[in-house]
Amino acid sequence: MVNNMTDLTAQEPAWQTRDHLDDPVIGELRNRFGPDAFTVQATRTGVPVVWIKREQLLEVGDFLKKLPKPYVMLFDLHGMDERLRTHREGLPAADFSVFYHLISIDRNRDIMLKVALAENDLHVPTFTKLFPNANWYERETWDLFGITFDGHPNLRRIMMPQTWKGHPLRKDYPARATEFSPFELTKAKQDLEMEALTFKPEEWGMKRGTENEDFMFLNLGPNHPSAHGAFRIVLQLDGEEIVDCVPDIGYHHRGAEKMGERQSWHSYIPYTDRIEYLGGCVNEMPYVLAVEKLAGITVPDRVNVIRVMLSELFRINSHLLYISTFIQDVGAMTPVFFAFTDRQKIYDLVEAITGFRMHPAWFRIGGVAHDLPRGWDRLLREFLDWMPKRLASYEKAALQNTILKGRSQGVAAYGAKEALEWGTTGAGLRATGIDFDVRKARPYSGYENFDFEIPVGGGVSDCYTRVMLKVEELRQSLRILEQCLNNMPEGPFKADHPLTTPPPKERTLQHIETLITHFLQVSWGPVMPANESFQMIEATKGINSYYLTSDGSTISYRTRIRTPSYAHLQQIPAAIRGSLVSDLIVYLGSIDFVMSDVDR
């Protein structure tokens, strides 16, 4: 069991600005590189943020990876356009910056490294030599910011089409369609686009056949039922055996992070539901918690429990779809229809509480949209009485089936080392024997007050183990819901804080000052203090996080969304090489991903 991250900060509110100079890793870095080798930034991220020189990057990364309790996972990597940022007191001069978020499982601690870059020299050495999963993150950072990673094995666009001009997350790049010239698809442009789609193996890092060997190249997707969305995998086959494969993503990209720079802190909430469109309120949780850190808001206990309750309902809802579609991918049709019957009961309950079903957009900065309705407890009790028996029937009728076991046991198997190298989280990581669930390791929204267990595998993560862990996670979510039902606190559903949005009625319409405040907050949105905040949660598919940068405005200066599905799809080639195409179908079904979560 990992140590609880809250030990060092148990007496401090989550939103306190800290430089984390007391974190042991800061001392280790200073002992190795000298006390003046870098700048420590005070933030509300909850992790040490260290600015280092570009020339030090690989040496510092290697040092952190080889510490006695090493930082073994590259959790996230991306960039920021710093040119319009006004609140940068005490930070190195930078037109752009790149950040590297590393996690140590043994310490249950993080560190964020930052590198400052000048606009006329947007080069930084590739991190893929230390962490293979840096590949996609560096491609995306180049695609959206134009930052070059020297030595990268295949630095090409990943979100945008190969013919795209410009880098969309730069501040001088238009954010609205009305800022572009009208689009016209001329014959010449159409021919250019078609030419760009011509498949050339060497552009994908694959080798062509020779006189002595020949391969078949096969497209799986982007329209294939087992691809679970607009997702393409280019397969290099020797007969039925997968010699190599390259996932091709970006078909579902909607510019969610760019939208965060146009919407107010409050009006961005509905967008979070649609990042991973099966998770509902689960996706709202990291965003509102990160904004509340910026605002300095501590919510009432009732809000915490309500948020946990809605999150676990959506976790069950998502897991039911995952388990049933996995069974369908293996070849059994009936369970998916049973699952949709059970999911309908959850949607009815969610609708009774929030007024909406799939995308409630119900969490608010400082609380929730409204209080629980009368009768919510009866509906939840009926569901809790119904679901355990149904779950047992899924397991007995389908998941213990010998054909399903034969198709999934030992398929696409990997160990803890591989999972950490590729940034795998959620059931895929825990199946390898690593007990890391954010709800336990780094409790948020009051999860530390609930009694539940974290299912963990025996050392190897294969398709069958991943699915069975999700089944047990369903049971644990039912335990949490039972406690929500029996121990729902009394109290307000919003925090009494000036930045709670929309503000409580008692803070509005009393006299001219409250009228003005209400008008500004509702029309323009609240003004968040200039700072940075970060929040990770245990989402339905793994760890989801929001890293927010405020420049003291009504909108976010930078909204970075790290999703689990993105990391999990990058791992596909490493896990499936040498297997059969039929094994790939089972593997895809066991990952639990949706393309909106990948492409954002």
Swiss-Prot record:
Predominant place of localization: membrane
Reaction equation(s) it catalyzes: a quinone + NADH + 5 H(+)(in) = a quinol + NAD(+) + 4 H(+)(out)
Keyword list, A-Z: Cell inner membrane, Cell membrane, Membrane, Multifunctional enzyme, NAD, Quinone, Translocase, Transport, Ubiquinone
NAD recorded as keyword: yes
Function per UniProt: NDH-1 shuttles electrons from NADH, via FMN and iron-sulfur (Fe-S) centers, to quinones in the respiratory chain. The immediate electron acceptor for the enzyme in this species is believed to be ubiquinone. Couples the redox reaction to proton translocation (for every two electrons transferred, four hydrogen ions are translocated across the cytoplasmic membrane), and thus conserves the redox energy in a proton gradient.
Membership in a protein family: In the N-terminal section; belongs to the complex I 30 kDa subunit family. In the C-terminal section; belongs to the complex I 49 kDa subunit family.
Full protein name: NADH-quinone oxidoreductase subunit C/D
